[in-house]
Amino acid sequence: MAAPSGGVNCEEFAEFQELLKVMRTIDDRIVHELNTTVPTASFAGKIDASQTCKQLYESLMAAHASRDRVIKNCIAQTSAVVKNLREEREKNLDDLTLLKQLRKEQTKLKWMQSELNVEEVVNDRSWKVFNERCRIHFKPPKNE
């Protein structure tokens, strides 16, 4: 699932997390998807499993790339905000509001960076399940 066309709101971490949750739907439902679309041995002749696995592979690749872009884009945006706040803080050491805002943005940045680790786990799980069911029907290209 691609990111919404209106762009991604990186300012509110809760919205960022909700977007990722929606974008991870394909990964959350992969077992169900494979069970309903890739035939068992007894039904192998009725459905083109290689085409089904290829389509699922392409969907997973697109979803993973899209989420990776969203996460890295938000990390870059938030890093820039943190950098600017640090520079302002150096000029105004007595400004407690500025310090509070800097801490808030630093925390948000750490949470966003931790989403990269979550993403790695989600992707690994999806590829494991995909390979268990599709390895005999579809071989992904070597360069990906």
UniProtKB/Swiss-Prot annotation:
Keywords: Acetylation, Coiled coil. The modification N-acetylalanine is found at A2. Residues 82-120 form a coiled coil. The modification N6-acetyllysine is found at K100. GO terms for cellular component: mitochondrial intermembrane space; mitochondrion. InterPro entries: MIX23. Belongs to the MIX23 family. This is Protein MIX23. It comes from Homo sapiens.
